[in-house]
A protein has these predicted regions:
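Short, flexible loop/turn elements at secondary-structure junctions
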Residues: 19-21, 82, 119-123, 137-139, ...
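Active-site metal-binding core of divalent-cation-utilizing nuclease and nuclease-like domains
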Residues: 4, 71-132, 152-155
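Core beta-strand-centered patch of the WYL/Sm-like small regulatory domain
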Residues: 50, 57, 61, 65, ...
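Surface-exposed cleft-lining segments at the edges of enzyme active sites
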Residues: 42-48, 85-87, 98-108, 139-148
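Short catalytic/ligand-binding loop motif for oxyanion handling, primarily in non-cytosolic enzymes
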Residues: 24-25, 84-89, 141-143, 189-191
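Internal, hydrophobic cores of structured domains that mediate oligomerization or house catalytic pockets
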Residues: 27-34, 44-89, 114-118
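Nuclease-adjacent, charged terminal/linker segments that flank catalytic cores
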Residues: 1-47, 51-53, 251-254
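Non-catalytic C-terminal interaction segments of nucleic acid-processing enzymes
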Residues: 141-254
Length: 254
């Protein structure tokens, strides 16, 4: 067992995959990398990493269960998207990474963004919504002037925004469009992110970034009007649900 990091309530127990378990999964046909040192990987799994990973898993499970109530809507989660990526991307070791270069302080700055999860909702008419999910645990700076060596929300916003303006998402993922969903820890942090977004984008692409918290999702459901953005509050992820502003469809699923 790797850990249990909640103080109250029914705490989930987290177990690591050891060599024997990996061997069994491989024998059952799962794609398990045999060269990995699972003991070392488990030892490196500290509490912040576990908390972040569990929060991602919780969000994906909420989405999966919520979408079951909407028959005809398919959910493609992360690696399920890979077969639909351009051929060159499918061959890459890091197919989910968007790399961009843009001017900053008189020099060209190269950065990359990798979503915590990439996913698509595919509707009965084969239109779809594409989302990059980011989980913010409240530990990273929202705004940092150090873009070269330090992680920050600003750096992620810059990466996604310039990837969008340079159409990197279309080149790498084959997406005609996408939105970034950020789950964070408080309303005040959302407001700080919205301020950072406005400074980064200059007010362009206001509907590209949406934000929510666990409290909002508990009240409205993860698909419902729990999301807020630069254009306003009360935004739903599904077109069939009440929303303050419908999300435009991204493109037709291949």
């Amino acid at each position: 067992m790797l850990g249990s990091f909640f103080d109250e309530g029914n705490a989930p127990l987290i177990y690591g995959l050891a060599k024997k378990g990996a061997r069994l999964l491989a024998e059952q046909g799962d794609d398990i990398a045999g060269h990995l040192d699972w003991t070392t990987k488990n030892a490196r799994a500290k509490v912040p990493f576990l908390a972040h990973t569990m929060t991602i898993a919780d969000a994906i499970l909420k989405l999966q269960f919520a979408l079951k109530a909407h028959s005809g809507t398919a959910f493609l989660d992360h690696h399920e998207l890979r077969p639909f990526f351009p051929e060159a991307t499918q061959k890459r070791a890091d197919p989910f990474r968007l790399s961009v270069t843009f001017p900053h302080d008189g020099r060209q700055l190269a950065i990359g963004v990798v979503p915590d999860r990439l996913m698509s909702f595919v509707y009965p008419d084969n239109t779809r919504h594409n989302f990059a999910l980011e989980i913010d645990m409240g530990t990273a700076d929202v705004w940092s002037n150090n873009l070269r060596t330090k992680s920050s929300i600003r750096k992620k916003l810059l990466g996604y925004f310039h990837a969008f303006t340079q159409r990197r998402h279309q080149e790498v993922w084959g997406f005609h469009g996408f939105r970034v969903l950020t789950l964070t820890v408080s309303e005040s942090r959302i407001q700080n992110m919205l301020k950072a977004q406005k400074q980064v984008t200059g007010g362009l692409a206001p509907s590209m970034f949406l934000y929510s918290t666990s409290e909002r999702i508990a009240e409205h459901g993860i698909l419902g009007p729990a999301w807020t953005g630069a254009n306003g509050d009360g935004i739903s992820l599904l077109p069939s649900l009440p929303t303050s502003q419908p999300l435009e469809f991204d493109h037709v699923h291949p």
